[in-house]
């Protein structure tokens, strides 16, 4: 009888061990399938699934001389940017020509000869996150270019660079119809600046509670991004993206005027110190904007 009990107990143990192993295998397979599905759904693309992937921007403001400008632009658009976008983590690039600069009379600018003053061209490169800019760093990428590429970059004057991370964004009414995915919109307004520490919370509240909603409620706004710096002179930046110049001209000032940058009707704009010649309105020259 004792042998029978012992045999039964041993049998139950074997059954439980086998059943437990099968259950663990099933759970493992299910988890692996889930991870695989999640990985596939996170693959970069041009649809809405990719909209959350470009969380860091490499922004360069600069000028160009007339001599050599056409050759530089051809090299930038046909060689430099396509090669850059083959690097891991690099998602899109947009090159802009500035239309206006300096902002309103209440805008204060930095008075420091060490801060470069270029503004006629603005190059924005979007990547997955700021870790991409750490290895290799942008200056190392430029140092490794062939001699022709280094000569082209040397044509830039007044070059100022900020590596920015996105603090947050709002999607505008024009985002659903926008066909260029993550790529910067055809018309932008961008400002980069510093703010006294004692005014930063109010400024942040002004953007979140007032300015971003006001811009994104307009018919032509694609998206608006509030940015903070990883490297560069400016600690803060704001990037408004519009589907067209016509829409920008119609909507930007109206939205700006009804959304004071502060709380309780107060504005911190007079406390901000902007980069030279900023903020800037600009139109995209690469990739070319399709004609309507």
Where are these regions (language model features)?
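Hydrophobic h-region of N-terminal signal peptides that target proteins for export
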Residues: 24-29
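N-terminal secretory signal peptides
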Residues: 1-14
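Sec-dependent signal peptide hydrophobic core
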Residues: 19-23
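N-terminal cationic leader/targeting segments used for protein routing and processing
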Residues: 4-6, 18, 39-41
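Hydrophobic alpha-helical segments, especially transmembrane helices
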Residues: 13-14, 18, 32
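Macromolecular interaction modules
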Residues: 40-292
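Signal peptide processing junction and immediate N-terminal pro/mature segment
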Residues: 31-42
């Amino acid at each position: 009888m004792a042998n029978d009990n012992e045999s039964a107990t041993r049998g139950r143990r074997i059954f439980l061990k086998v059943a437990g192993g099968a259950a663990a295998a099933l759970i493992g397979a299910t988890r692996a399938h889930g991870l695989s599905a999640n990985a596939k759904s996170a693959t970069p693309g041009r649809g809405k699934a990719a909209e959350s992937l470009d969380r860091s921007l490499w922004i360069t403001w600069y000028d160009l001389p007339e001599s050599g400008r056409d050759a530089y632009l051809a090299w930038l658009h046909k060689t430099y940017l396509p090669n850059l976008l083959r690097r891991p983590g690099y998602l899109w690039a947009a090159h802009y020509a500035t239309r206006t600069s300096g902002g309103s009379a209440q805008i204060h600018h930095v008075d420091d000869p060490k801060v470069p003053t270029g503004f006629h061209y603005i190059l924005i490169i979007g990547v997955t996150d700021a870790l991409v800019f750490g290895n290799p760093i942008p200056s190392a990428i430029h140092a490794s270019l062939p001699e022709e590429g280094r000569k082209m970059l040397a044509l830039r004057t007044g070059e100022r660079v900020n590596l920015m991370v996105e603090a947050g964004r709002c999607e505008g009414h024009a985002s659903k119809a926008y066909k260029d995915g993550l790529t910067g919109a055809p018309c932008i307004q961008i400002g980069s600046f510093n703010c006294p520490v004692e005014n930063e919370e109010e400024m942040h509240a002004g953007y979140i509670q007032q300015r971003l909603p006001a811009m994104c409620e307009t018919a032509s706004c694609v998206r608006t991004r509030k940015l903070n710096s990883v490297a560069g002179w400016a600690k803060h930046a704001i990037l408004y993206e519009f589907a067209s110049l016509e829409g920008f001209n119609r909507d930007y000032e109206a939205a700006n005027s009804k959304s004071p940058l502060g709380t309780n009707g107060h504005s911190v704009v007079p406390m901000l110190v902007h980069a030279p010649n900023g903020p800037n309105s600009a139109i995209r020259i690469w990739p070319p904007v399709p004609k309507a």
